[in-house]
Design a protein with these regions (language model features):
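Mid-to-C-terminal catalytic subdomains of enzymes
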Residues: 120, 147-201, 205-215
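Short, aliphatic-rich beta-strand segments
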Residues: 46, 213-224
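ATP-dependent adenylation/nucleotidyltransferase module used to activate substrates
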Residues: 1-162, 203, 218
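Conserved beta-strand segments that form the floor/walls of ligand-binding pockets within enzyme
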Residues: 23, 175, 221
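Acidic-residue sensor for enzyme active/binding pockets
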Residues: 59, 198, 221
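A broad detector of the eukaryotic-type serine/threonine protein kinase catalytic domain
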Residues: 19, 95, 181, 223-225
Length: 225
């Protein structure tokens, strides 16, 4: 299918949902999804965002302004991943536990608004990577409209640009927990240290980089833009 056919299918699928809550991170995928859902369903859409220390502040700058401009009802919840014993020990499937807890909170907010359908921004590209968090989506019956319409990251960028979304060329961020090797304890102090280091690099003008922690050694990865 070409991108316009996928776009038409996406809107048709969304129309059938009726009333929905969008898991909104402020990134490329969820911003595009939220925009299309709102265009199709209007006030039958709410956005629910989760703020954690594992998401650098710079990654969601602009998201609250976007939602306000669109006139979408927006809920923001604070969640401390460190409270999950199965997460802070950093096992290979940590994303599953974290994702499930986050989704349960979103489901609770949606239920209070009389909404039973939750959607997220997963797309075709997500099927190519190791994504233990997808198990949580399946278990909790979360819908992925972009995936159902066969949309790739490239499709989403093209359509986001056409819609004039500020996120159309935004890079996909990686959770701060990914900066640690499996089995390395994730603590608030270590996350704060990495956030500070990455902000210094961002202030220098770099956009594609990671600071990874290996015991007491920090490794900086930078990609030429």
């Amino acid at each position: 299918m070409d991108v316009e056919t996928k776009y038409a299918l996406l809107k048709e699928n969304i129309k059938n949902y009726g009333k929905i809550a969008v898991a909104y991170s402020g990134g490329l995928d969820s911003t595009f999804l939220l925009k299309v859902c709102h265009d199709v369903l209007g006030d039958n859409v709410i956005a629910v965002s989760i703020r954690t220390d594992l998401q650098p502040v710079r990654e969601y700058l602009g998201s609250e302004e976007f939602v306000k401009k669109e006139g979408i009802k927006h809920f923001i919840l604070k969640f401390n991943d460190y409270t999950l014993p199965c997460f802070k020990n950093n096992p290979p499937d940590r994303c599953y536990y974290c994702k499930k807890e986050i989704l349960l909170r979103i489901i609770n907010v949606a239920a209070n608004e009389g909404i039973t359908t939750i959607v997220d921004g997963s797309n075709m590209d997500d099927l190519c990577d190791y994504r233990p968090g997808r198990r949580a989506l399946t278990e909790l019956h979360i819908k992925s409209p972009l995936l159902e319409a066969g949309m790739t990251k490239k499709d989403i960028r093209v359509l986001s640009q056409k819609l004039g979304l500020y996120t159309w060329n935004k890079l996909s961020p990686a959770c701060m927990a990914s900066r640690f090797p499996y089995g390395t304890a994730i603590t608030p102090e270590r996350i704060a240290m990495l956030n500070k280091a990455e902000q210094v690099i961002a202030d220098l003008g770099f956009t594609q980089f990671r600071v990874r922690l290996h015991d007491e050694v920090a490794r900086i990865e930078v990609i030429n833009d």
